[in-house]
């Protein structure tokens, strides 16, 4: 599950992990017995001190062939507020809101594709 989190200025929230290169949309796995929306709220809280300011909308479900042929990624779009700045920790090295015209260096190719799809600048793909 990934979340495209926008603030009131229309900026996108991205995270840079300690264990992977590049900038990503926040998100993570869904635990057994956990709903997608529960996972979304947990991940945005953990990765950015974010709270939903709008109802999350399912944008698309992608097949991700990177790890297996059974991995599906649900991408949600929502507006958020940040309760306090996110300090770096063992998982998140850096995070922040970015204007779509001024993304940080190192945004992953998949993240750039998702942002283009969300903006209506690219056709929605079926594969992550």
Question: Each PLM stretch: what is its role?
Answer:
Residues 61-86, 96, 111-114, 119:
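Active-site-adjacent beta-strand/loop module that shapes the phosphate/pyrophosphate-binding cleft
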Residues 51-60:
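A short coil-to-beta-strand element that immediately follows conserved catalytic motifs
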Residues 7-47:
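Conserved Nudix-box catalytic region and its N-terminal flanking loop in Nudix hydrolases
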Residues 8-10, 79-84, 100-102:
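Short loop segments at secondary-structure junctions
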Residues 5-6, 14, 78, 97:
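Conserved hydrophobic "DFG−1" position in protein kinase catalytic cores
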Residues 1-12, 61:
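Conserved N-terminal beta-strand and adjoining loop/helix that marks the start
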Residues 21-22, 90-128:
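Nudix hydrolase/Nudix homology domain
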């Amino acid at each position: 599950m990934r979340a495209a989190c926008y603030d009131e200025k229309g900026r996108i929230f991205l995270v840079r992990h300690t264990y992977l290169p590049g900038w990503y949309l926040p998100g993570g796995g869904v635990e057994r017995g956990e709903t997608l929306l529960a996972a979304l709220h947990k991940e945005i809280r953990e990765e950015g001190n974010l709270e939903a300011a709008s109802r999350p909308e399912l944008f698309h479900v992608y097949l991700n062939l990177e790890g297996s042929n059974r991995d599906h990624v649900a991408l949600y779009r929502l507006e958020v507020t940040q309760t306090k700045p996110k300090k770096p920790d063992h998982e998140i090295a850096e995070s922040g809101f970015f204007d779509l015209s001024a993304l940080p260096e190192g945004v992953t190719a998949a993240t750039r594709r998702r942002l283009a799809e969300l903006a209506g600048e690219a056709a929605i793909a079926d594969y992550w």
